[in-house]
Amino acid sequence: MSIGILETVLAIYRDPMRVAEVRDRPLPEPMAPVIRVAAGDAGLAAEWAGASGESREDIAEACVFFLQQILFAPGADAYRVLGASADAPQARLREHYGLLMRWLHPDRN
């Protein structure tokens, strides 16, 4: 479980005024679980809900909010949009791309 990233996601969700400070920093790691929850991974959302005391719905909303505000910020480069740094391995870029497509593609089930 990635408690560190969960704490960051929930902090931004609870206090949106912190978005600007997080946008100015390198992305926290690992980002894949955040994208997985946004893409509908109910098991991970339930695990995080149990660890945090939040509802699964709030966990999912917090992940979506985090991604919208931090990855898709104006001026974000292509790597940041994928939830990675410029030195990320190709496999991570592919994984994040697939997860983002699962979340955002209009033909998703």
Model-assigned labels for residue ranges:
Residues 81-84, 95-109:
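The canonical J-domain HPD catalytic loop and its flanking helix-turn segment that engages Hsp70
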